[in-house]
């Protein structure tokens, strides 16, 4: 294993054992590395005091590091949601969010710095894409939130900054690590996508290759029930018609055996009319899937409106009358710009 600038987070037990052997140490040293990385959550190699100091120094001199992130700011919302601003090794900023609810802790992780998709209602894409995150940077977000709450996460959702399907291999590598090394069940992990042409079959095939079986949830951010409206909200939809997108969802189901859930942001007087609910039911009714509604969370510089509770309730009841299983996601962390659609890598 080439040692130049290796980040240890994301490496599994066999890879860490191989690293130890490659450096003249025993398999046992690799197991110790694994334990201290994933059970104790160390930030620096020097903190792994069970390893010989000479070997620790040798690893550091060869450019090997844990590969964690540095917390540069923390925002605590009134509902106890915590947003962390985390600095990468090259000085970029990632936002990640911890959402407590009873005995559960959901961590919302980012997969990219910025986003190229340009969704009109989302703050993340306002500055475009800077780069995609590496597996260590994704896994490190989980450790940072775990440390902030002093408790282990129950769920991880890829709903932070970026489009996960434009970073498929690193996202799947991180899911593999979260599952096998941190012990987070795949069924407690959700990957959200706005839809990227030609990636759903690739996701299914690579997920089977990386994970052996696909148990995580794929959530499709639909946000509009027809092509014209969707294109006005999501520029990338111009190259990916809803009909083809839903065909790919069915193909994904055939390949993985896992149903796709649908997400729909409600924008006041724009996509929240009864006829929109009826159109949405027509689109997704055959999937026997869950629809997760999200009331718009305001961002600077946009004139979209959050719908009234009455309009939200009418939309929900319309879907339910059509036999659609639907839920409304609570807007957590709204007062600290930590809610869905509000993350942005610029607030220091």
From Swiss-Prot:
It is an enzyme of class 2 (transferase). Residues 101-335 form the Radical SAM core domain. S-adenosyl-L-methionine binds at residues 162-163, 192, 221-223, 297. It comes from the Bacteria. The active site is at residues 95, 340. GO terms for cellular component: cytoplasm. Its cofactor is [4Fe-4S] cluster. Its main location: cytoplasm. Keywords: 4Fe-4S, Cytoplasm, Disulfide bond, Iron, Iron-sulfur, Metal-binding, Methyltransferase, rRNA processing, S-adenosyl-L-methionine, Transferase, tRNA processing. Pfam families: Radical_SAM, RlmN_N. It catalyses: adenosine(2503) in 23S rRNA + 2 reduced [2Fe-2S]-[ferredoxin] + 2 S-adenosyl-L-methionine = 2-methyladenosine(2503) in 23S rRNA + 5'-deoxyadenosine + L-methionine + 2 oxidized [2Fe-2S]-[ferredoxin] + S-adenosyl-L-homocysteine; adenosine(37) in tRNA + 2 reduced [2Fe-2S]-[ferredoxin] + 2 S-adenosyl-L-methionine = 2-methyladenosine(37) in tRNA + 5'-deoxyadenosine + L-methionine + 2 oxidized [2Fe-2S]-[ferredoxin] + S-adenosyl-L-homocysteine. One of its GO terms (molecular function) is tRNA binding. SUPFAM superfamilies: Radical SAM enzymes. It is found in: Cytoplasm. Binds 1 [4Fe-4S] cluster. The cluster is coordinated with 3 cysteines and an exchangeable S-adenosyl-L-methionine. GO terms for biological process: rRNA base methylation; tRNA methylation. Disulfide bonds join 108-340. The keyword Cell wall biogenesis/degradation does not apply. Its EC number is 2.1.1.192. [4Fe-4S] cluster binds at residues 115, 119, 122. CDD domains: Radical_SAM (cd01335). Reaction proceeds by a ping-pong mechanism involving intermediate methylation of a conserved cysteine residue. Belongs to the radical SAM superfamily. RlmN family. Specifically methylates position 2 of adenine 2503 in 23S rRNA and position 2 of adenine 37 in tRNAs. PANTHER family: 23S RRNA METHYLTRANSFERASE, RADICAL SAM CORE DOMAIN-CONTAINING PROTEIN. This is Probable dual-specificity RNA methyltransferase RlmN. It comes from Prochlorococcus marinus (strain SARG / CCMP1375 / SS120).
């Amino acid at each position: 294993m080439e040692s130049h600038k290796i980040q240890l987070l994301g490496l599994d037990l066999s890879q860490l054992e191989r690293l130890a052997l490659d450096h003249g140490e025993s398999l046992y040293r690799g197991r110790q590395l694994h334990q201290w990385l994933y059970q104790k959550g160390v930030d620096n190699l020097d903190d792994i005091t069970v390893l010989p100091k000479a070997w620790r120094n040798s690893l550091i001199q060869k450019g090997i590091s844990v590969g964690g992130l540095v917390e540069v700011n923390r925002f605590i919302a009134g509902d106890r949601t915590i947003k962390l601003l985390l600095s990468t090794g090259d000085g970029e900023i990632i936002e990640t969010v911890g959402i407590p609810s009873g005995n559960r802790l959901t961590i919302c992780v980012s997969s990219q710095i910025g986003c190229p998709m340009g969704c009109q209602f989302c703050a993340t894409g306002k500055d475009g894409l800077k780069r995609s995150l590496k597996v260590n940077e994704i896994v490190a977000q989980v450790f940072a939130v775990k440390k902030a709450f002093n408790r282990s996460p129950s769920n991880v959702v890829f709903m932070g900054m970026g489009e996960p399907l434009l970073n498929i291999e690193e996202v799947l590598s991180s899911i593999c690590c979260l599952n096998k090394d941190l012990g987070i069940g795949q069924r407690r992990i959700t990957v959200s996508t706005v839809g990227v042409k030609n990636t759903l079959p690739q996701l299914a095939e690579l997920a089977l290759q990386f994970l052996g079986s696909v148990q995580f949830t794929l959530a499709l951010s639909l946000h509009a029930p027809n092509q014209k409206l969707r294109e006005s909200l999501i520029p990338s939809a111009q190259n990916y018609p809803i009909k083809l997108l839903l065909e790919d969802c069915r193909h994904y189901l055939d390949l993985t055996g896992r149903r796709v859930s649908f997400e729909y942001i409600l924008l006041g007087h724009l996509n929240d009319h009864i006829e929109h609910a009826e159109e949405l039911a027509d689109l997704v009714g055959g999937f026997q899937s869950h629809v997760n509604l999200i009331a718009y969370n305001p961002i600077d510089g946009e004139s979209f409106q959050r719908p009234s509770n009455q309009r939200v309730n009418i939309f929900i009841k319309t879907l339910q009358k059509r036999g659609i299983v639907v839920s409304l996601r609570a807007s957590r962390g709204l007062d600290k710009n930590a809610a869905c659609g509000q993350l942005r890598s610029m607030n220091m």
